[in-house]
Structures are given as structure tokens and as C-alpha cells.
Amino acid sequence: MEKKIIFLCFLVALLTFPEFISSEVIRDSVIHDEEKFANRSYCIKTCATEFTGGDESRIKDVRPRHYKCVCWYYSD
């Protein structure tokens, strides 16, 4: 039983490892003047346009903040 638990932990770590080494995640923000807190879809589109050339699949996460969107995106 103990070997199965260790094997499962190793397997989970192995499956998540490529995400960490595949590309660097960059944190940056975009200022917007339209709303105090923009909605999430607006932030995704704005961050994709600003940092990835419109590629929304490279956006990892966004957080609407006070008159800005905080973006996490993959460098390559």
C-alpha cells in the first residue's frame, strides 16, 4: 500500500513537471480606463492583444484589479 502511494505521488509530480519546464510564466499588467473593475473575458482579450499578439491560449490567468488587469502568460 505504501509503495502505491509513493508511486502515485511520483506519477503526479512527473505529469506536472513539463508545465514548469516548458516555458516561463510572466506576470504583467495592463491599465484600462473604461471600468473600475473589468470583467474576466475583457482582461483575457486585452492581455492576449497586448502581450501575445492575440493568442489567448498562451494566457495562463488574469485578475481584474482597480483600473487594471493583471496577466500571467507563457513567454513561448
UniProtKB/Swiss-Prot annotation:
Tissue specificity annotation: Expressed by the venom gland.
PTM (free text): Contains 2 disulfide bonds.
Keyword terms of this UniProt record: Disulfide bond, Secreted, Signal, Toxin
GO annotation, cellular component aspect: extracellular region
Subcellular location as annotated: Secreted
Signal peptide positions (record): 1-23
Molecular function via GO: toxin activity
Superkingdom of source: Eukaryota
Family per record: Belongs to the scoloptoxin-15 family.
Protein name: U-scoloptoxin(15)-Ssd3b
